[in-house]
Protein backbone atom coordinates (compact mmCIF):
# COMPACT_ATOMS: atom_id res chain seq x y z
CA UNK A 1 0.00 0.00 0.00
CA UNK A 2 1.15 3.55 -0.77
CA UNK A 3 0.98 5.02 2.72
CA UNK A 4 2.44 8.33 3.89
CA UNK A 5 3.61 8.85 7.48
CA UNK A 6 1.99 11.88 9.13
CA UNK A 7 4.23 13.67 11.65
CA UNK A 8 3.26 16.12 14.39
CA UNK A 9 5.12 19.30 15.41
CA UNK A 10 7.69 17.22 17.29
CA UNK A 11 8.26 15.08 14.18
CA UNK A 12 6.67 12.04 15.83
CA UNK A 13 4.45 9.64 13.91
CA UNK A 14 0.81 10.62 14.44
CA UNK A 15 -1.05 8.77 11.68
CA UNK A 16 -1.10 7.84 8.02
CA UNK A 17 -2.36 9.17 4.73
CA UNK A 18 -2.85 7.12 1.59
CA UNK A 19 -2.06 8.01 -1.99
CA UNK A 20 -4.67 7.23 -4.66
CA UNK A 21 -4.53 3.54 -5.61
CA UNK A 22 -4.10 4.48 -9.28
CA UNK A 23 -0.60 5.83 -8.55
CA UNK A 24 0.82 2.34 -7.99
CA UNK A 25 -0.80 1.06 -11.20
CA UNK A 26 1.11 3.45 -13.47
CA UNK A 27 3.43 1.86 -16.04
CA UNK A 28 7.03 2.27 -14.71
CA UNK A 29 8.17 3.03 -18.27
CA UNK A 30 6.75 6.54 -17.85
CA UNK A 31 9.25 7.17 -15.07
CA UNK A 32 12.09 5.91 -17.25
CA UNK A 33 11.08 8.19 -20.13
CA UNK A 34 10.78 11.25 -17.91
CA UNK A 35 14.09 10.75 -16.10
CA UNK A 36 15.83 10.14 -19.42
CA UNK A 37 14.31 13.35 -20.80
CA UNK A 38 15.19 15.34 -17.66
CA UNK A 39 18.84 14.26 -17.69
CA UNK A 40 19.08 15.00 -21.41
CA UNK A 41 17.69 18.47 -20.76
CA UNK A 42 20.34 19.35 -18.17
CA UNK A 43 23.19 17.78 -20.14
CA UNK A 44 26.09 20.17 -20.61
CA UNK A 45 26.84 20.50 -24.30
CA UNK A 46 30.58 21.04 -23.86
CA UNK A 47 32.14 18.68 -26.43
CA UNK A 48 33.14 20.79 -29.41
CA UNK A 49 35.51 20.25 -32.31
CA UNK A 50 36.41 22.47 -35.26
CA UNK A 51 35.62 21.61 -38.84
CA UNK A 52 37.74 22.91 -41.74
CA UNK A 53 35.60 26.02 -41.86
CA UNK A 54 36.72 27.05 -38.35
CA UNK A 55 40.42 26.08 -38.30
CA UNK A 56 42.71 29.03 -39.00
CA UNK A 57 45.41 28.80 -41.65
CA UNK A 58 45.76 26.33 -44.48
CA UNK A 59 44.69 28.70 -47.22
CA UNK A 60 47.90 28.29 -49.16
CA UNK A 61 48.69 25.07 -51.02
CA UNK A 62 51.69 23.62 -49.07
CA UNK A 63 53.58 22.52 -52.20
CA UNK A 64 53.09 22.21 -55.93
CA UNK A 65 50.80 19.52 -57.24
CA UNK A 66 53.33 17.53 -59.27
CA UNK A 67 57.03 16.89 -59.49
CA UNK A 68 58.02 16.37 -55.83
CA UNK A 69 57.45 12.61 -55.66
CA UNK A 70 55.20 13.01 -52.61
CA UNK A 71 51.47 12.89 -52.09
CA UNK A 72 49.51 15.88 -53.34
CA UNK A 73 48.09 18.28 -50.74
CA UNK A 74 45.84 21.30 -51.03
CA UNK A 75 45.75 22.48 -47.39
CA UNK A 76 47.53 21.94 -44.07
CA UNK A 77 44.22 21.98 -42.23
CA UNK A 78 42.50 18.85 -43.52
CA UNK A 79 41.64 16.17 -40.99
CA UNK A 80 44.63 14.00 -41.92
CA UNK A 81 47.13 16.69 -40.86
CA UNK A 82 48.35 17.30 -37.30
CA UNK A 83 46.76 20.57 -36.23
CA UNK A 84 44.07 20.13 -38.83
CA UNK A 85 40.30 19.94 -38.54
CA UNK A 86 38.20 17.08 -37.17
CA UNK A 87 35.90 15.25 -39.55
CA UNK A 88 32.38 14.61 -38.24
CA UNK A 89 33.34 15.52 -34.66
CA UNK A 90 30.90 16.71 -31.96
CA UNK A 91 29.85 20.37 -31.86
CA UNK A 92 28.14 22.41 -29.16
CA UNK A 93 25.25 23.07 -31.52
CA UNK A 94 23.79 19.62 -30.77
CA UNK A 95 20.45 19.71 -28.96
CA UNK A 96 19.86 16.79 -26.58
CA UNK A 97 16.26 17.77 -25.74
CA UNK A 98 13.79 14.88 -25.59
CA UNK A 99 10.09 15.67 -25.53
CA UNK A 100 7.83 14.17 -22.88
CA UNK A 101 4.18 15.17 -22.93
CA UNK A 102 2.32 16.48 -19.87
CA UNK A 103 0.47 13.24 -19.25
CA UNK A 104 3.67 11.19 -19.17
CA UNK A 105 5.29 13.74 -16.87
CA UNK A 106 2.31 13.50 -14.53
CA UNK A 107 2.25 9.69 -14.59
CA UNK A 108 5.99 9.56 -13.88
CA UNK A 109 5.50 11.72 -10.77
CA UNK A 110 2.59 9.57 -9.58
CA UNK A 111 4.63 6.38 -9.93
CA UNK A 112 7.70 7.90 -8.24
CA UNK A 113 5.55 8.99 -5.28
CA UNK A 114 3.90 5.55 -5.08
CA UNK A 115 7.27 3.76 -4.97
CA UNK A 116 8.61 6.15 -2.34
CA UNK A 117 5.45 5.73 -0.24
CA UNK A 118 5.63 1.92 -0.49
CA UNK A 119 9.16 2.16 0.90
CA UNK A 120 7.82 4.25 3.81
CA UNK A 121 9.96 7.22 2.85
CA UNK A 122 7.35 10.00 2.52
CA UNK A 123 6.60 12.10 5.59
CA UNK A 124 3.74 14.61 5.71
CA UNK A 125 3.85 17.60 8.07
CA UNK A 126 1.60 20.60 8.65
CA UNK A 127 4.30 23.12 7.78
CA UNK A 128 8.01 23.45 7.16
CA UNK A 129 8.94 27.08 7.65
CA UNK A 130 12.16 28.49 9.05
CA UNK A 131 11.52 32.11 9.98
CA UNK A 132 15.14 32.67 11.01
CA UNK A 133 16.49 31.61 7.63
CA UNK A 134 19.37 29.88 9.44
CA UNK A 135 20.93 26.67 8.13
CA UNK A 136 21.40 25.47 11.71
CA UNK A 137 17.63 25.34 12.23
CA UNK A 138 17.17 23.49 8.93
CA UNK A 139 19.84 20.96 9.92
CA UNK A 140 18.02 20.30 13.20
CA UNK A 141 14.86 19.35 11.30
CA UNK A 142 16.75 16.80 9.22
CA UNK A 143 18.47 15.51 12.36
CA UNK A 144 15.15 15.04 14.18
CA UNK A 145 13.72 13.16 11.21
CA UNK A 146 16.76 10.85 11.17
CA UNK A 147 17.00 10.77 7.39
CA UNK A 148 20.12 10.64 5.26
CA UNK A 149 18.89 13.14 2.68
CA UNK A 150 15.55 14.70 1.85
CA UNK A 151 13.48 16.46 -0.76
CA UNK A 152 11.45 19.18 0.98
CA UNK A 153 8.18 19.97 -0.80
CA UNK A 154 6.38 23.14 0.26
CA UNK A 155 3.01 24.34 -0.94
CA UNK A 156 4.36 27.87 -1.34
CA UNK A 157 8.11 28.28 -1.15
CA UNK A 158 9.34 31.28 0.86
CA UNK A 159 12.77 32.92 0.69
CA UNK A 160 13.71 32.30 4.34
CA UNK A 161 13.12 28.55 4.16
CA UNK A 162 14.93 28.32 0.83
CA UNK A 163 17.88 30.22 2.30
CA UNK A 164 18.03 27.94 5.35
CA UNK A 165 18.11 24.68 3.38
CA UNK A 166 20.25 25.93 0.51
CA UNK A 167 23.57 25.27 2.25
CA UNK A 168 22.68 21.68 3.14
CA UNK A 169 24.19 19.38 0.54
CA UNK A 170 21.80 16.54 1.39
CA UNK A 171 18.58 18.58 1.00
CA UNK A 172 16.66 20.32 -1.74
CA UNK A 173 13.58 22.53 -1.32
CA UNK A 174 10.99 22.76 -4.07
CA UNK A 175 7.56 24.26 -4.62
CA UNK A 176 4.61 21.87 -5.02
CA UNK A 177 4.10 23.11 -8.58
CA UNK A 178 7.75 22.44 -9.47
CA UNK A 179 8.26 18.98 -7.99
CA UNK A 180 9.00 16.26 -10.54
CA UNK A 181 9.63 12.53 -10.75
CA UNK A 182 13.40 12.92 -11.05
CA UNK A 183 13.69 14.83 -7.77
CA UNK A 184 11.42 12.38 -5.94
CA UNK A 185 13.50 9.45 -7.23
CA UNK A 186 16.86 11.07 -6.46
CA UNK A 187 16.37 11.62 -2.73
CA UNK A 188 15.95 8.77 -0.27
CA UNK A 189 13.20 10.60 1.67
CA UNK A 190 10.48 13.13 0.86
CA UNK A 191 9.18 15.59 3.46
CA UNK A 192 6.02 17.22 2.20
CA UNK A 193 3.57 19.72 3.61
CA UNK A 194 -0.02 18.47 3.76
CA UNK A 195 -1.16 21.43 1.67
CA UNK A 196 1.50 20.60 -0.93
CA UNK A 197 0.37 16.97 -1.03
CA UNK A 198 -3.19 18.14 -1.61
CA UNK A 199 -1.99 20.39 -4.44
CA UNK A 200 -0.11 17.53 -6.12
CA UNK A 201 -2.88 14.92 -5.82
CA UNK A 202 -5.52 17.43 -6.93
CA UNK A 203 -3.74 17.86 -10.27
CA UNK A 204 -3.96 14.17 -11.08
Swiss-Prot record:
One Pfam family in the UniProt entry: Ribosomal_L4
Source organism, top-level taxon: Bacteria
GO cellular component, one term: ribosome
Keyword Hydrolase part of the UniProt annotation: no
Keyword Cell membrane: no
Reported function: One of the primary rRNA binding proteins, this protein initially binds near the 5'-end of the 23S rRNA. It is important during the early stages of 50S assembly. It makes multiple contacts with different domains of the 23S rRNA in the assembled 50S subunit and ribosome. Forms part of the polypeptide exit tunnel.
Stated name of the protein: Large ribosomal subunit protein uL4
Name of the coding gene: rplD
Amino acid sequence: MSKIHVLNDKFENSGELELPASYAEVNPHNLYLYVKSYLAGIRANSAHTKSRAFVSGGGKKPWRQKGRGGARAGSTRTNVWVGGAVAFGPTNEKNYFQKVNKKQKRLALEYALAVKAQDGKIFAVDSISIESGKTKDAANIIKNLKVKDALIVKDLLDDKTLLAFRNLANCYVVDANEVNAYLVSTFSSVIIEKAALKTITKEG
